[in-house]
């Protein structure tokens, strides 16, 4: 983290930090990054997302687990930006999800605001814990706590290290 640490991440920077790609890249922008502390992700929900074909035909509802994954991706971007991990083959693994509650349906046309706050973890730590909440137009859609392991491989994925 330096004085030049960005407070926002556009899709280009997000893709330089996260290994996720379509159809599993679930955050479009991250703003209000407070290094190693918190951030707000944005996810524009569109009818073109593949899960809407079967969840549910005629009544498209974003699966709750994808909302939680979007919060986790937001948290990973916050840590990745804070630690200057763009282009460094940064990986994050879910370790646990606690106290998850879904409060409203999310569907095409909604913009998810993904608020994440680190409750455990510090620069260089492998295990982090976060509180997250997802909102649509200021209305709570989901809230949970989750734990993740941050991993910085010594070689690109798929290559021997």
UniProtKB/Swiss-Prot annotation:
Reaction equations catalysed: a (3R)-hydroxyacyl-[ACP] = a (2E)-enoyl-[ACP] + H2O
Record has Lipid metabolism as a keyword: yes
GO BP, sorted A to Z: fatty acid biosynthetic process; lipid A biosynthetic process
Residues annotated as the enzyme's active site: 55
Enzyme Commission identifier(s): 4.2.1.59
Keyword Protein transport included in the entry's annotation: no
Domain of life of the organism encoding this protein: Bacteria
UniProt-listed InterPro entries: FabA_FabZ, FabZ, HotDog_dom_sf
Gene Ontology terms, MF aspect: (3R)-hydroxyacyl-[acyl-carrier-protein] dehydratase activity
SUPFAM superfamilies from the UniProt entry: Thioesterase/thiol ester dehydrase-isomerase
Keywords: Cytoplasm, Lipid A biosynthesis, Lipid biosynthesis, Lipid metabolism, Lyase
Cellular component aspect of the GO annotation: cytoplasm; membrane
Compartment(s) where it occurs, according to its Swiss-Prot or TrEMBL record: Cytoplasm
NCBIfam families to which the protein is assigned, alphabetical: fabZ, PRK00006.1
Role summary: Involved in unsaturated fatty acids biosynthesis. Catalyzes the dehydration of short chain beta-hydroxyacyl-ACPs and long chain saturated and unsaturated beta-hydroxyacyl-ACPs.
HAMAP family according to UniProt: FabZ
Family per record: Belongs to the thioester dehydratase family. FabZ subfamily.
Protein name as catalogued: 3-hydroxyacyl-[acyl-carrier-protein] dehydratase FabZ
Organism encoding this protein: Jannaschia sp. (strain CCS1)
Gene responsible for this protein: fabZ
